[in-house]
């Protein structure tokens, strides 16, 4: 599937992801494969099966794909991003223990990153800028 440029070209591929994730939902609802989705307990298991040729591709969040391609996979290729379904949006955050003395410090740092535009610049560079993958439809 390395040369795929459309969702239609993915329908007969064996695609894997971690069970119980929004990535699974995206495969089911966006790709709508003609094959059974290969589900794994962890994304590490899915990438291991991809590397060994047991599955044709994986679906997960874009930052993880870039990391795996650059640091873990031998010859990995990112063909693109799936379009959103409109029903869910990926959101990430920082988790601290309740009552952590770091809470105020982390909030202050995030507010400062937002205020001076650094957060938007980081998002553009790492999530949606030149390092992003094209939307495939």
What are these regions (language model features)?
Residues 1-137:
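Proline/Glycine/Serine-rich low-complexity intrinsically disordered segments
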């Amino acid at each position: 599937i390395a040369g795929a440029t459309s969702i239609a070209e993915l329908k007969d591929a064996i695609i894997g992801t971690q069970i119980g994730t929004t990535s699974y939902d995206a495969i089911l609802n966006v790709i709508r494969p003609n094959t059974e989705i290969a589900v794994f307990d962890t994304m590490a298991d899915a990438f291991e099966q991809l590397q060994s040729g047991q599955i044709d591709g994986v679906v997960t969040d874009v930052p993880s794909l870039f990391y795996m391609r650059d640091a873990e996979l031998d010859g990995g290729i990112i063909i693109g991003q799936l379009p959103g379904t409109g029903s869910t949006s990926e959101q990430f955050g920082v988790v601290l223990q309740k009552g952590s003395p770091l809470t105020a410090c982390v909030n202050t740092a995030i507010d400062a990153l937002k205020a001076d535009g650094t957060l938007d610049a980081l998002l553009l560079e790492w999530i949606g800028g030149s390092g992003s993958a094209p939307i495939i439809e």
